[in-house]
Amino acid sequence: MASGVTVNDEVIKVFNEMKVRKSSTPEEIKKRKKAVLFCLSPDKKEIIVEETKQILVGDIGEAVPDPYRTFVNLLPLDDCRYGLYDATYETKESKKEDLVFIFWAPDNAPLKSKMIYASSKDAIKKKFTGIKHEWQVNGLDDIKDRCTLADKLGGNVVVSLEGVPLK
């Protein structure tokens, strides 16, 4: 069921910037987004970038020691969101980076919000061409353990996520 919600051009721009890894200067790399959340506009007619809910590659280290944990902490406990997370992980063979589309619909979000976000999900997914991994998350228990994301990325072949070895 389509909701009639549109996707703001800035959302598509952010996705394309995260998807395309062109050779960049160190300064440009620091400004690249590692993770970003998208929400519905106040009038519920458009999916927009949630400007204050993002992690830049340049922040990783001192300001953001663990980007995965920081991303989880950006998620609101009482409302839905869409997210893009640029996962850096290692398999037994090689290092990899993949974008993960996350539909966050916590159990205690208002029913109306869950319905609008669920029915608008296809609108944003259609704009995110080439995404290999999609994950619907319904609560912190589903997302707080990085092993769950590792399973989505490649099951038992993933040995570390964001430089942290998996147990």
Swiss-Prot record:
Q: Which species is listed as the source?
A: Xenopus tropicalis (Western clawed frog)
A biological-process GO annotation: actin filament depolymerization
Describe the function of this protein: Controls reversibly actin polymerization and depolymerization in a pH-sensitive manner. It has the ability to bind G- and F-actin in a 1:1 ratio of cofilin to actin. It is the major component of intranuclear and cytoplasmic actin rods.
Q: Which UniProt keywords are present, listed alphabetically?
A: Actin-binding, Cytoplasm, Cytoskeleton, Nucleus
Lineage top rank: taxon? Eukaryota
The question of whether Transmembrane is a record keyword is answered with: no
Q: Name one GO cellular component term.
A: nuclear matrix
Q: What does the similarity note say?
A: Belongs to the actin-binding proteins ADF family.
Motif (Nuclear localization signal) positions are 30-34
Q: Where in the cell is it found?
A: Nucleus matrix; Cytoplasm, Cytoskeleton
Q: Pfam families annotated for this entry?
A: Cofilin_ADF
Q: InterPro entries, alphabetically?
A: ADF-H, ADF-H/Gelsolin-like_dom_sf, ADF/Cofilin
Start and end of every ADF-H domain?
4-153
What GO molecular function terms would the record report? Answer: actin filament binding
Q: What lineage is on file?
A: Eukaryota, Metazoa, Chordata, Craniata, Vertebrata
Protein name as annotated: Cofilin-2
